[in-house]
Each structure stands twice: as C-alpha cells, then as structure tokens.
Amino acid sequence: MPLEIVTVPCLSDNYAYLIHDADAGKTALVDAPEAAPIQSELDRRGWSLDQVWLTHHHWDHVDGLAALRDRYKPTVIGAEADAHRLPPLDLAVSEGDRFDLGGAPVEVLDVSGHTVGHIAFHLPTGKAVFTADSLMALGCGRLFEGTPDQMWASLSKLAALPDDTLVCSGHEYTQSNARFALSVDPDNAALKTRAAEIDQARAEGRPTVPSLLSLEKSTNPFLRAADPGIQSLLGMQGADPARVFAEIRARKDHF
C-alpha cells in the first residue's frame, strides 16, 4: 500500500505533514508548528505518532513539539549541524544519511540557504520530498543565514530529483510567489495557467501545496536561473546561475 501524505494547516500560513505507512502502522510528522491541529488530525484518523522530522530550527516549525512529545513519545529526528539550537534530538542526521519509516526509506538532504543546517527529507518510494523553507511552491525561502551560492546549490540538488516528485513545502505563500514570478517571467504560459489555478484554489480555501517538481521546474523562477530566457529577461545573458539566482532573490526581497 502506498504511503499516505496529509497536509496539515497550522498557525496562519504554515504547513505540517503527516506520512502514514499503513502496512507497518507507522506515522511520521514533518515539522511541528503547533500541536492542536496535528493532534486533531491524528485523532481523526486513529493514528499514533512514531517519528517527528525537523527541517530547521525556526520557532514556527518546532513550537508544537513539546506537547506532541509529551503525548506520543515519538523519535525526534533533525540535523546534526543544527542540534545545538533544535529541541533535543533522538537521532541526529546529516546529508546522505538514511533511516526508515516502517518499510519506507528516507533520505536526508542538506538544503542550507534559508538557514545553515536546513535539511529536507526525501521519500524515494513515496515520490515526495519535504522541503519546508528551502524550495517552496513558486518560490524559495528568504536567505536568513545562508548565501546565494548555498541556496542555488540546494535548489539544484532538489531539482535533480525525479520530475514526478511531490514538493511538500512549509508555507502558504504561493499566491504572492505567483505575482512575483509573473513580474520576472511574464510570458510563461504555464506560469500564467498555474497562477490562475492558485487563485481559484485559495478562493475555495484549498492548499496550493504539495506541488509537482516538474511544474516547479517549468514555472518557479528560482529554479530557472540557468535558463537563457530568464537570463535574457533579467539582462544577465551567460551569467553564472548562482549570480542570476541572487538577483532574482534580491528582487523578491524588495517586491
């Protein structure tokens, strides 16, 4: 039976994710913005909580962990590089490490940029990657700690995953990201179609995530810094993609 992935809205615009392996009867949580909606979803489905995967240290991704830990006693997994500023970890992991959720392997990717020590969790058999505030729907996280070179390397790593991978990001920023993307790439037909679909989804109260990696690669300007068309629109033909990415990120910061 395939893994079940459930998007859980938290706080004002955060998302947590529950991953359930029905064959093994095991459930993991990606990030813990607040406990109440996560507990409610677990109760509604009759699931316990076996693992919590933390992507980075920001409060809006960890604030609900203490209550969840008290109730469920899960194994808490996070980045070894971030262990000094994360809640106490039961398992500290780094780039290239693997662990299992029931029968499903989980691969750890270093995606530093938004923070130094940010990690993503890739489920190759579940065809999903949990990116939090690194790669986002039509965007990427602001560079609070890392450099443009680091974030471009992280995004390039994520873009190399299979096209049918679901990108499970950490916030509902997609409408504003779409407006910015159209300012950078106004003639992209796929982007215009996607922006209209996003507006419709939000009007109906539906999440715009997860998104498909193939769609991100064709519409997300932060993944397209090496694209000659984007470079031409920015007046940066032939420039190093990391420099082009830095320019796109700077424009977004002031958009």
Swiss-Prot record:
Entry keyword annotation includes Metal-binding: yes
Reactions catalysed, as given in the entry: an S-(2-hydroxyacyl)glutathione + H2O = a 2-hydroxy carboxylate + glutathione + H(+)
Superkingdom of this protein's organism: Bacteria
Cofactor: Zn(2+)
Entry's Gene Ontology molecular function annotations: hydroxyacylglutathione hydrolase activity; metal ion binding
Pathway in which the depicted protein is active: Secondary metabolite metabolism; methylglyoxal degradation; (R)-lactate from methylglyoxal: step 2/2
Record keywords: Hydrolase, Metal-binding, Zinc
Presence of the UniProt keyword Zinc in the record: yes
Gene3D superfamilies hit by this protein: Ribonuclease Z/Hydroxyacylglutathione hydrolase-like (3.60.15.10)
SUPFAM superfamilies given in the database record: Metallo-hydrolase/oxidoreductase
InterPro entries documented for this protein: Clx_II_MBL (IPR035680), Glyoxalase_II_hydrolase (IPR050110), HAGH_C (IPR032282), Hydroxyacylglutathione_Hdrlase (IPR017782), Metallo-B-lactamas (IPR001279), RibonucZ/Hydroxyglut_hydro (IPR036866)
UniProt EC number: 3.1.2.6
Residue numbers binding Zn(2+) 1: 56, 58, 114, 133
Subunit structure comment from the entry: Monomer.
PANTHER family xrefs: HYDROXYACYLGLUTATHIONE HYDROLASE, HYDROXYACYLGLUTATHIONE HYDROLASE GLOB
Family: Belongs to the metallo-beta-lactamase superfamily. Glyoxalase II family.
Function: Thiolesterase that catalyzes the hydrolysis of S-D-lactoyl-glutathione to form glutathione and D-lactic acid.
Name used for this protein in its record: Hydroxyacylglutathione hydrolase
Originating organism: Ruegeria pomeroyi (strain ATCC 700808 / DSM 15171 / DSS-3)
Taxonomic lineage of the native organism: Bacteria, Pseudomonadati, Pseudomonadota, Alphaproteobacteria, Rhodobacterales
